C-alpha cells in the first residue's frame, strides 16, 4: 500500500510556556518540522489553533494527547490508513466492564458493554472535514471532549482502530507509577 508520511508536527502549549517549549524543542535534533502554537482555554481551542497552523495542502490531521506517551508507530499508521475510506479514524479499546448510567446516586440502567469502546488518541481526520466540524461546533456552542464527537454532529463516518492498554493517559499518581514501570 501507499506509505503515508507526516510532514509537520504541531504542539499546542499554554501561552505562558511558548518560549520555554520552543527553546526545549529547539535543542532536540529532529528531521521533521515542529511548529509550536499557543493553545487555548479548552481542548477545542487548542485543536483549532493547531489545525489552522497546518498547511492548507495537508490532507489529514492526526491529533494526539501528549498525556499518552506510549503510542506505537503501528497504531499511528493504522489510524492514517483507516482514513483512506472514511472521514476519520479514532483509536479505541473495547470495554470489558459492566457500564451503568446513574442519576442522583442510583442506577438508572445498564448499557450493553459490547457497544462501548473507550476512545484514545490519535484521532485522525481529513483536514477540511475537521475544520467544518470545528466551525459547526463554534457556531452552535457545542462543547466536546474529543474531536470525534464534533465529527459525529455532522454525521461523518469515523472508523475505529483497535488500540492497546499501554496507550493509556497519564492523569493520576497511579498512572505515573504505571508509566514509570513501563519505562524502566
Where are each of the predicted segments found?
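Acidic helix N-cap motif at the loop->helix transition within catalytic regions
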Residues: 19-24
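Short, small-residue-biased leader/transition segments that mark boundaries at the very start
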Residues: 1-6
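Conserved donor nucleotide-binding strand/loop of the catalytic core
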Residues: 29-41
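Conserved beta-loop-beta/alpha segment of the NTase-like Rossmann-fold superfamily
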Residues: 43-106, 120
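A structural signal for isolated positions on well-ordered beta-strands in alpha/beta enzyme cores
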Residues: 8-10, 35, 159
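Short internal beta-strands
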Residues: 9-14, 92
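A recurrent flexible, glycine/aromatic-enriched loop bordering the glycosyltransferase active site
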Residues: 109-119
